[in-house]
Amino acid sequence: MIPSLREWYEKYGDKGLVVIGNHFPEFSYERDLDNLKDAIVRLDVPYAVMQDNDGKTWKAFNNRYWPTMYLIDKQGHLRYFHIGEGAYQKTEDAILALLAESYP
């Protein structure tokens, strides 16, 4: 998933796409901020990543599975989500549709 997110960030970031990774740790060592920073560098993640140690964001989206992708429009409404790997073309099509929308 990270390669696709990286590609979309680089391709559409200047067109308004904002990518934010949500890191919800599964293991105790993943809670350490330095370990997360190392992983961001090692995996060449160019977009923002938040550390969700207490799971507040995870719970707010009623998330039970990862990876999960959410697309939120410019007005803050959830417009698309996908659970698991795959559906990359469908997700990119949804990104393009949202970027094409105009807002007052």
Report each predicted region and the residues it spans.
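Generic structural signal for helix capping and beta-alpha/helix-loop junctions
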Residues: F27-Y29, T57, G86
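A short acidic, helix-capping loop that chelates divalent metal ions and anchors anionic groups
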Residues: N22, E30, L78
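Short, solvent-exposed loop/turn and secondary-structure capping segments
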Residues: M1-I2, D32, F61, F81-I83, ...
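Conserved helix-turn-beta segment immediately C-terminal to the redox Cys motif
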Residues: M1-H23, I40-L43, A97
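Short, internal strand/loop/helix patches
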Residues: V18, D34-D73
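Thiol-/selenol-based redox modules, centered on thioredoxin-like
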Residues: G16, Y65-P104
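Extracytoplasmic/secreted proteins, especially bacterial periplasmic and envelope-associated proteins
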Residues: S4-E7, R31, N35-D38, K56, ...
